[in-house]
Amino acid sequence: MDEGKRILVIEDDPILRDLLTDWLLAAGYSVDVAAEGGAGIAHARAYRPTLVVTDIHMPGTGGAAVISEVGRIYPGIPVIAISAHFRSNHGLKPEEAIALGAARALAKPFKRKDMVGAVIELVGPPAA
């Protein structure tokens, strides 16, 4: 596993958080997790991930703040925003997440190939 490609997953739903972790580990990446935005931002400050995947709608600090703060602290780190609300008329829209600084916005539910493909596109495949 490539220790140099560490993905931080910030997701309040434990089932989806575990699923994303499993997908990214199976793809060969190292994965860290946080259950809400404030903890995710603190983790990003301490460990400088290669890429951040964040839910937009979470209790406490939401994904919009995560995108802005990660971009402020580490301008080169890509962020993938995820949300079920991207498919509805409620909350942040995908283009708004991109305008905040997200590199990609994926609507839930998404497929494994879409998430892993976006990670590979943004940071490259893990080293063999």
Task: Locate the predicted segments by residue.
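Acidic, metal-coordinating helix/loop segments flanking the phosphotransfer/catalytic sites
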Residues: 33-51, 93
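Alpha4 helix (beta4-alpha4-beta5 surface) of REC/receiver domains from two-component response regulators
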Residues: 65, 86-106, 113, 117
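Non-catalytic signal-transmission and effector/linker regions of two-component phosphorelay proteins
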Residues: 1-8, 113-128
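Active-site residues of response regulator receiver
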Residues: 55
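The feature encodes the CheY-like receiver
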Residues: 17, 59
